[in-house]
Amino acid sequence: MPESLVILPEFPQNIRVINQGEPDGQDWAFKITSSSGRDVFAVAISPVNNSRTGPTWSYIFDADGLTTVDLGTPNSFANLEKAYSRTGISVREIDRLIITHGHSDHDGTVPEFLSKSGAEFCAHESYSALKGFDQWDIQDRTSSPLQIELEQLGREKIDRNVYKERYELHEAYYEARKTTSVDRNLVDGSTIPGATIFSTPGHSPDQICVQIDDLILTGDHVLPEITPHPTSKMLFREDIKKSPLVEALSEEHLYGLGTYIESLGKVIALGEEVRLLPAHRLFNKGQLNLCGVERASDIVLHHQRRLERLYGHIGRGKSNLTDLTTSLFERSKLLGGNLMAALSEVVAHLELLDDVGDIEISNEGSMTLIDLETPRYVDFIQNIAIDS
């Protein structure tokens, strides 16, 4: 590991710059020291194609061997090797690999990484169960009126031929993922040398955070500048349920906006002493985004405001998914593939309003308010704040 590191006065004293990169975070590398003196290397892994979220940040620390957390997008393995070389570390030296969740910008180069390093592969127990399936195809789309309408709108509005190349890359990623084997399934409270694991589902069912002293590697659970996309509620297709690994999973506790907000509460409860190290936007717009748990509180507030807006729109007579989505998002965020992301985000919020008893959803998918003095979603969020 390099001895001569440049200290820049604008950064906290426990953070040293190893490599100065671009304003958008590309090519940066840092050494971050925890409260106990443990060093964590943070390196930006550039994607092959442009990404709105920027590079994926991979973290490396030494405790009974070198551990790596998250890798990057498919086809970016050469970029990863180059980024690691800036720290003086070779992929071959890595003893343990942890993936914070099974999205392609985090586990996209796992097959190549394992082949070259021989590292022990660790991930949440639901990652093992679901890695053989496309995350968009496991849902029973007839499970609720909202899911039925979401599926219909997707077929009507999205031309798969336009995104043919993207779908082919997507399929290749899942096929490659099937070839990997997880050596250790992690659960809430699992420990590995130097770190503790927290299960924080909601953005993804297998999302975990990794605590190293006062440093929390959050994956996509908590991000600066952008709010992670929550999952909608899940009911597995019947054929998926019959998989021995999947049938042990609880869809109720791994998916949905309510689950995500509860997981944010878990991070908030860690207290003001910790610092969050995200998988995206650690460095962006020429500045370091080193956040505390207040960022998790900000994201909870974001969703509370979105629930408030939807509740108000329904009260004013907007009663279907299309109208509510166009009321919530500007037109530029409803173009192309962004449309499904916006629709599914609205579905996640409507499901929570339905679950807590604030709205009724007919079999046709129309929505009406239940007449209450105080909406129940307010109590739901306040209770999480109190517990935190």
Walk through the language-model features, giving the residues of each.
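Short Pro/Gly-enriched beta-strand edge/turn motifs at strand-loop
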Residues: 37-46, 166-172, 193-195
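Active-site HxH/HxHxD metal-binding segment of metal-dependent hydrolases
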Residues: 4-10, 54, 76-78, 85-190, ...
